[in-house]
Amino acid sequence: YLTLAMGKTDRKEFVPILLKDLPTSFGDNQLTLIHALGLLRDERATGPLIELADAPDARTRLEVIISLGNISSNKAVPVMEKALHDNEPNVRWDAAIGLAKMGNNSGSDLLLNLMSRDYLKRYDEVDLEERTETILIAIQAASYLNDVRLYNKIRELSQNDPVLKVRDEAQKALDLLL
């Protein structure tokens, strides 16, 4: 709990303390350290996190990609682009979202998929509420990019999605893009 609390403080002096424990941590402790470093958004964590990006455990890879996306360092772009091809869908999806927030469109095909209810239905573990939340996040991420395909998909969602919250978020994104 202390580790997570450090991450939520936005106090950069905790970064060296967290980084010191990262190499010797494992399991849930390591995941919490990675998460806390991502919350602090300090570039000093980029290198050590990159070293964990190829971890055999999908949960570790996912947490690393989310944290690297939060930090938004250009040094992480190659690792995040590689993660677009990870065998774990959540890793791919979060890589696309993180890259988009950095203005990198290499995951735009995945963002298009994430804004498609038909695509998300292929994943049984993603329930209706999670589909809606995923679409909302993808809309927000896509709004960082200047991509006509994403724009057209957002426009389509603003007019036709069955969920009012999605239509509203899509319209807000369109207003920002215009």
Q: Would you name each region that the model predicts?
A:
Residues 1-12, 17-23, 28-43, 47-54, ...:
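Structural detector for internal amphipathic alpha-helices that build alpha-solenoid repeat scaffolds
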Residues 86, 101, 113-114:
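Active/binding-pocket-proximal capping segment
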Residues 110-113, 117, 121-129:
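Intrinsically disordered, low-complexity segments enriched in Gly and acidic/Ser/Thr residues
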Residues 115-117, 152-160:
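TPR/TPR-like (Sel1-like) alpha-helical repeat modules
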